[in-house]
Amino acid sequence: MKRIIFEIVFIATTWYIFLPPFNLTSWEFIFFLCGHLVVMGILFSFRKDTNLLKTVHVRHGKVANELNLEGLHFNKLGGGLLLVSGIIFALAGLVSLVTSSFFQAKNYANVVSITEKDFKDFPKSDTSKVPILDRSTAEKIGDRYLGSLTDKVSQYVAADTYTQLTVDGKPYRVTPLEYADPIKWFNNQSKGIGEYIKVDMVTGNAELVDLKTPMKYSDSEYFNRDVKRHLRIKYPTKIFKTPSFEVDDEGNPFYVATVYQKRFGLGVPRPSSVIILDATNGETKEYSLDEVPEWVDRVYPAEETIEQINYNGKYKDGFWNALISKKNVTQTTEGYNYLSIGNDIYLYTGVTSANADESNLGFILENMRTGEITKYNLASATEESARASAEGAVQEKAYKATFPILVNLNDKPLYIMGLKDNAGLVKEYALVDAVEYQNVIVAATVDELLSKYANKNDLELDNETVENIKGVVADLKSAVIKGDTVYFFKVDGKIYKVKASVSDDLPYLENGQSFEGQVGKDNYLKTFKVK
């Protein structure tokens, strides 16, 4: 009886700690089940009158306890439990083998559906919404911002979540605060966590968002208010991984857990539904994939999507072709990023041949809420080649480029990226031609970068924040502002400004000359050309 009670307590404790789903298609549960069958088999293989531990003498009169193997004998019950464990594990291994890519190559290739288009169909880029900063930079900005708030940093730290979302059409990374240590949790858990950090991925501005109702459920909670444990208790049979922290359009905090079902036995997991947990009160609701609220951004995780896109590129012509001849075998490039398009967030990565050469065959965009995947065919340089080209343009500064993002400016494919110093902060920006990647433009701001590109290529960039202007220069003057030479002049009595970096013509500009360009709301000319 004692052994039965011990095993029941042991099962409950290990389940509460490791939280495997009660689902036979989950390897977590299979290991959990087989492990406990082995433990029970060993326990019931000891004679009832045998102490499981025995005292042994060590040197110098010291004693220690060790397992009493002398009392171990495999009776029918103990041996049967061990046999059942072995059978279950063997069957799971057999099913796993049968559902592997060796036998199911076509099924692996068809796990995702990819629509192919030409680059002319690639969404036009709104440069005011391109997330130039990368995750590590956002983390540094957010952590430093919290460190400046002395009343918060003594009790809380920033979680390492930093989920990228699209909020009101703009890209942000958000992360909740978490208790600095168990003592801080004990002192503050009754009132909860009242703030989260929000970092603008375009400007780099950080803010601490105050919540009307504090979060009582988070990853830094203990016991039943831990997010994953709370969900597991309410949904014991569902397969899900670590839920993502998200906020809705009103800034309310939630945790979003994608529920998976295995394709063909123990094969590839695919999303089947979504569970949303209100972080303020613990209320949950499960949605089918076609009912997911529009504010939810991350239903299809990036790493799994990329893996399954690679299945498609690898196995579309069969297992042996992928292994030997590799004809038409493709794979995603190393690294990925995110784009905000409309109110959704899209996964972006390149596609190259299996030979992993220096050129891309195209680009992938995946709507992370709906799972729709589109491949845009375009022969171009890989992201790593573009990064190397950008870093080479400023090699004297030893800057490191962030992972590039493909943008469509006037139907031209370009990589845009930040250039970071040794401290991990973005100091300059680079624009690299995706086809002729030796063509690089570098500037201190994104606006200057785009202005340089427009002037160099005699283009008018599509941007709602600028308007065309032309006229005759009058009252020309110049001044140095924050290290930049700025030219001032009047047109019809109105003062306009333009930085020297915008055009090589500016040092030679004279009163009475005609010009044309584009001006922003701040009266700075974004492009400038002498007529």
Regions flagged by a language model, labelled:
Residues 6-531:
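Soluble extracytoplasmic regions of secretory-pathway and membrane proteins
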